Each structure stands twice: as structure tokens, then as C-alpha cells.
From Swiss-Prot:
EC id: 4.1.1.48
The entry's keywords: Amino-acid biosynthesis, Aromatic amino acid biosynthesis, Decarboxylase, Lyase, Tryptophan biosynthesis
Keyword Aminoacyl-tRNA synthetase recorded: no
Annotated source species: Streptococcus mutans serotype c (strain ATCC 700610 / UA159)
Lineage, highest ranks first: Bacteria, Bacillati, Bacillota, Bacilli, Lactobacillales
Record's protein name: Indole-3-glycerol phosphate synthase
GO biological process: L-tryptophan biosynthetic process
Length: 255
């Protein structure tokens, strides 16, 4: 993988679209609304726990994991949502993983992929996702808004991912309610938790915010907890000897 990660993966996504059909929309899986849950449980830093076998930056993380068991451990440990990598080429994920996990837990599931088309959104919803990811850096603002509105029209919630102030302003502009701040630069792969801290000064009270990437310890959690409703954690949980203990370490009391 080159340092030009985002253009490379978006090119791959365009190629995948050629063979992707527009599925008929199936009933939405019933669970709670993530936005409402995060607003109601603001006294504790909530955990979005990720199931991922590999990543371009880390390589293989946990290829032999029982994905359903892992997800059920996350739910039992108190995770607010489970993020499921569905990209095959770069993250060794699969849309079937999302379906299997969504059918085995009762909490919201996030379709974690590089979504650039309505067909991907419908496919994710049909696989049980109740939340999808849209990345500001991956889409022109007009297209981002179109996909956001399309997903919302299907009853889905949308996690809109940002990395800098201009992207955060776009997220606010399109009406995003759930906004992620990725501490990882998708071009250079570099991770800096200060990204979350710097952008937090521009947050709005009517939104919820999730800090993503580079959070491994309770100390990391303490840095972002005053400003964020939740953190998205993948590698630290996939490599943990005891998932419940790790979630407890990260889900710190904000009171």
C-alpha cells in the first residue's frame, strides 16, 4: 500500500461498483438510535467496538478471530455499537461479516467501508447495518449530501467522518448529527490524537462526536473524554487478551 491510500482505495471502490447491483430494500433491523443513546448516556465515554481482521496500516491483526463471538463479547462488555469492516481488499472484511454479526447482536451495527454510491448503502442496510459511514475526504460535498440524505431516507443513521476543520465544517453544513474525528490521516497514515483535541473547540451542542483511531489505553480515553461522546476502537480490542477488561479500561466515567 502506497502513502496515497485514499485515492487507491477509492479507485478500487469504483471498480467494485461495476459488478454491484442495486438490491431491493429489506426491512430495517430494529435497535436503538445511536444518536439518542449517546445523548442519554453522556456521563460515560461510550465505546464503538470494531471487528477488523487486518488494516493497511497494521497488516494482519487477528485473522483467526471468531467474528460473531468477538461481537457478542463487545455487546456483553457494554459497547454502544459494533463497527464491522466490510472492505475485502484492504481490510480483509466482508459484507457477510456484517450480516452474521448483525444477526447475532441487538445493538446498532456500523457498516465500515468507503461508501461512494447508493448501491453500497442499500447493501449495507440489507446486511443489518443501522448506521453507515460516510467519509468527507472521499466525496465532493454535493455528493456527500446526496448520499447522506439517501441513507437517512432509508431510516439509517450516518457517521460522518472528518479529519480537519474544513471537513468538520462540511459535516456541520450537511446536517450531520453523528460526527467522527479520525485521528489518522488517510493519506499519510500518521496518527495524532491532538487532531481530536484541536477540532473539539469547534463542536456544537446539538451533535454527538466520536474520536476514531489511535486510542489504546485508558490514558488515551481520558484525553478525549471531556469533549467526545464516544470513541471508536478496533486494534486495541482485537488484540486484547480480555475484551471485557479492555472495554472497562477505555469506557471511563466522565463524571
Amino acid at each position: 500500500m502506497t502513502k496515497e491510500f485514499l485515492p487507491t482505495i477509492l479507485k478500487q471502490k469504483q471498480e467494485e461498483l461495476a459488478s454491484l447491483i442495486m438490491e431491493e430494500v429489506k426491512p430495517l433491523r430494529l435497535t436503538y438510535r445511536l444518536f439518542d443513546f449517546l445523548k442519554e448516556h453522556h456521563d460515560q465515554l461510550q465505546i464503538v467496538a470494531e471487528v477488523k481482521k487486518a488494516s493497511p496500516s497494521m497488516g494482519d491483526i487477528n485473522l483467526d478471530v471468531d467474528i460473531v463471538k468477538q461481537a457478542q463479547m463487545y455487546e456483553a462488555a457494554g459497547a454502544a455499537m459494533i463497527s464491522v469492516l466490510t472492505d475485502q481488499v484492504f481490510f480483509k472484511g466482508n459484507i457477510d461479516f456484517l450480516a452474521e454479526i448483525s444477526g447475532s447482536v441487538s445493538i446498532p451495527t456500523l457498516a465500515k467501508d468507503f461508501i461512494i454510491d447508493e448501491k453500497q448503502i442499500v447493501r449495507s442496510r440489507n446486511a443489518g447495518a443501522t448506521v453507515i459511514l460516510l467519509i468527507v475526504a472521499a466525496l465532493p460535498e454535493k455528493r456527500l449530501k446526496e448520499l447522506y440524505d439517501f441513507a437517512a431516507g432509508l431510516g439509517l443513521e450516518v457517521l460522518v467522518e472528518t479529519h480537519n476543520l474544513s471537513e468538520l465544517e462540511i459535516a456541520h453544513r450537511i446536517g450531520a448529527q453523528i460526527i467522527g474525528v479520525n485521528n489518522r490521516n488517510l493519506v499519510t497514515f500518521e496518527v495524532d490524537i491532538n487532531t481530536s483535541l484541536e477540532l473539539s473547540t469547534h463542536f456544537r451542542d446539538d451533535k454527538v462526536y466520536i474520536s476514531e483511531s489511535g486510542i489504546f489505553t485508558g490514558q488515551d480515553s481520558k484525553l478525549v473524554a471531556p469533549y467526545f461522546n464516544a470513541i471508536l476502537v478496533g486494534t486495541a480490542l482485537m488484540q486484547a487478551d480480555n475484551v471485557a477488561d479492555k472495554v472497562k479500561e477505555l469506557a471511563i466515567d466522565k463524571g
